[in-house]
C-alpha cells in the first residue's frame, strides 16, 4: 500500500491551477533564447471563455449560412484564413506576459506575435495545454 496521502477535489482543480501563469523559456534549436513567456493553462476560465466565444461566433455564422442557403441565396464559406486566425487568437489569449522582448506586453502585441511567428504560437499552445505545468501534486 502506498504512503501517499489521498488528494482532495481541490487538489485536482485544473481550472484553478490553470489560472496561475506558468513561465517557460522559448528555445531556438534547443538552445536558450533569453525570451520567456508566461501562459495561462488551457483549462483556465479565461482561455475556456475565449474558446467558447470564438466557437459560438463560428456556429452563429454557420446557422446564418444555412438559413441563407434554404432561402435560395448564394452560399458562402469560411476561408482558411479564418481558421488560421482562430488558432492565432487561441494562442494569444493564453499569453499573459513576456520577458526578453523589447516591445511591451499587451493583448494586441500578443496577437501580433502569434500572427507573425507560428512556431512561438504553437509552443505557447503546447505549454498551455500541458497540465503538468500547472498541477503540482
Question: Where are these predicted regions, by residue range?
Answer:
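Generic structural signal of hydrophobic/aromatic residues within well-ordered alpha-helices
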Residues: 12, 47-55, 86-87, 91, ...
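C-terminal charged interaction modules
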Residues: 97-137
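Polar low-complexity intrinsically disordered regions enriched in Ser/Thr and small residues
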Residues: 33, 44-45, 75, 100-103
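Negatively charged, Asp/Glu-rich surface segments that serve as flexible interaction/assembly modules
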Residues: 51-96
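Short, charged/polar N-terminal "headpieces" of proteins
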Residues: 1-63, 134-137
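Solvent-exposed, flexible loop/coil residues
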Residues: 13-16, 94, 102-105
Amino acid at each position: 500500500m502506498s504512503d501517499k496521502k489521498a488528494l482532495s477535489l481541490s487538489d485536482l482543480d485544473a481550472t484553478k491551477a490553470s489560472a496561475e501563469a506558468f513561465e517557460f523559456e522559448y528555445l531556438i534549436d534547443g538552445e536558450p533564447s533569453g525570451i520567456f513567456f508566461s501562459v495561462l493553462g488551457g483549462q483556465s476560465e479565461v482561455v475556456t471563455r475565449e474558446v467558447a466565444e470564438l466557437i459560438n461566433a463560428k456556429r452563429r455564422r454557420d446557422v446564418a449560412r444555412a438559413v441563407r442557403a434554404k432561402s435560395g441565396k448564394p452560399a458562402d464559406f469560411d476561408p482558411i484564413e479564418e481558421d488560421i486566425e482562430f488558432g492565432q487568437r487561441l494562442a494569444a489569449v493564453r499569453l499573459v506576459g513576456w520577458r526578453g522582448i523589447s516591445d511591451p506586453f499587451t493583448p494586441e502585441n500578443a496577437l501580433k506575435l502569434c500572427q507573425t511567428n507560428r512556431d512561438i504560437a504553437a509552443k505557447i499552445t503546447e505549454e498551455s495545454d500541458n497540465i503538468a505545468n500547472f498541477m503540482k501534486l
